[in-house]
């Protein structure tokens, strides 16, 4: 009888053990299925993220191709502070690109494009190239500067404040490089270029002209027009700060900031049209003595350099 009882107990224990094992095995299988499903979900999410990253990288490449190759930016490591691009050039850095400068009276360092071609040492204060940048800006924008200081040939205005700080350091030459849509190029150069301070409303002053584009700034091309077309000693005007000699607001009509008289024979900050244009006013990128009032130029570079600049050939 005792043997039978022992046999039954062993049998019951074995059966319970099998049931417990089966239950545990079932739980393990369920856990495995759950983990396998989670892994599949994570793999799906990773693939989706990879696809999204690839899409964003493609879009970025398209944008860069559309904007043009990034230009060089040179960090000179703070070895010394340069007042303008001519000092950088004569310190042995001969490659065009963006550099940091700090004019003598400036409280801040700022970026600028240095044109190290054409004799080298040119500080670019304005550039037009493709019409991407809006030049119909308010006084504060023109005072502090705006535009693309990264891309190759990016359009920008260095800022009246910065141009004043540069030109008050000494005697500067302004060179203006102009190109039309027929791939012709001209230039205009002025000695003794200077932009006054804020109290003078950033008044424009310049000296003797030389070049191939004609002297649009002084208005001497036609004595009867000079009194209203000359930009000499004109204050800077914007749509919200009217300092011109016109009964209306030249900056508002021409949709740009500039040293307007009544109104202009040159407006290099004008609306970007492609060559000949029709508008209510002559508000294009205009250099009258080359293409007249009703032709808008393709590209403009305004750049300055000390009059007494002697390039270091080493």
Swiss-Prot record:
Pfam families linked: Fibrinogen_C
Disulfide bonds: 85-114, 250-263
Annotated signal peptide: 1-22
Domain Fibrinogen C-terminal, chain residue ranges per copy: 76-308
Subcellular location: Secreted
CDD domains to which the protein is assigned, alphabetical: bZIP (cd14686), FReD (cd00087)
One example GO MF annotation: protein-macromolecule adaptor activity
Coiled coil stretches, renumbered: 25-59
Biological processes per GO annotation: adaptive immune response; blood coagulation, common pathway; fibrinolysis; hepatocyte proliferation; negative regulation of T cell activation; platelet aggregation; positive regulation of heterotypic cell-cell adhesion; regulation of immune response
Entry's Gene Ontology cellular component terms: extracellular region; fibrinogen complex
UniProt function note: Immune suppressive molecule that inhibits antigen-specific T-cell activation by acting as a major ligand of LAG3. Responsible for LAG3 T-cell inhibitory function. Binds LAG3 independently from MHC class II (MHC-II). Secreted by, and promotes growth of, hepatocytes.
Subunit structure of this chain's protein: Homodimer. Interacts (via the Fibrinogen C-terminal domain) with LAG3 (via Ig-like domains 1 and 2).
Cited NCBIfam families: GGGWT_bact
Protein known as: Fibrinogen-like protein 1
């Amino acid at each position: 009888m005792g043997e039978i009882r022992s046999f039954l107990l062993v049998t019951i224990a074995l059966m319970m053990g099998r049931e417990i094992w089966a239950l545990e095995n079932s739980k393990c299988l369920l856990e495995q299925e759950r983990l396998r499903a989670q892994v599949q979900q994570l793999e799906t999410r990773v693939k989706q993220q990879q696809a999204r990253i690839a899409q964003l990288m493609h879009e970025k490449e398209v944008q860069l191709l559309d904007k043009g190759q990034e230009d060089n930016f040179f960090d000179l490591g703070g070895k010394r502070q340069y007042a303008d691009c001519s000092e950088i050039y004569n310190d042995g850095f001969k490659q065009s690109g963006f550099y940091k400068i700090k004019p003598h009276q400036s409280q801040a360092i700022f970026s600028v494009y240095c044109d190290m071609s054409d004799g080298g040492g040119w500080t670019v204060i304005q550039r037009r190239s493709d019409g991407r940048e809006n030049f119909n800006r308010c006084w504060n924008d023109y005072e502090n500067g705006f535009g693309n200081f990264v891309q190759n040939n990016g359009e920008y205005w260095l800022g009246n404040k910065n141009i004043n700080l540069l030109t008050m350091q000494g005697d500067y030459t302004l060179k203006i490089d102009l190109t039309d849509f027929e791939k012709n190029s001209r230039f205009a150069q002025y000695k003794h270029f200077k932009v006054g301070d804020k109290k003078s409303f950033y008044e424009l002053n310049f000296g003797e002209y030389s070049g191939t584009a004609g002297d649009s700034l002084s208005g001497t091309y036609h004595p009867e027009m000079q009194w209203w077309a000359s930009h000499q000693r004109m204050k800077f005007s914007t749509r919200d700060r009217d300092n011109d000699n016109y009964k209306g607001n030249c900056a508002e009509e021409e949709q740009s900031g500039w040293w307007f008289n009544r109104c202009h024979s040159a407006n290099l900050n004008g609306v970007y049209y492609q060559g000949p244009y029709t508008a209510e006013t002559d508000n294009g990128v205009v250099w009258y003595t080359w293409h007249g009032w009703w032709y808008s130029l393709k590209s403009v570079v305004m750049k300055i350099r000390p009059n007494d600049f002697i390039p270091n050939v080493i």
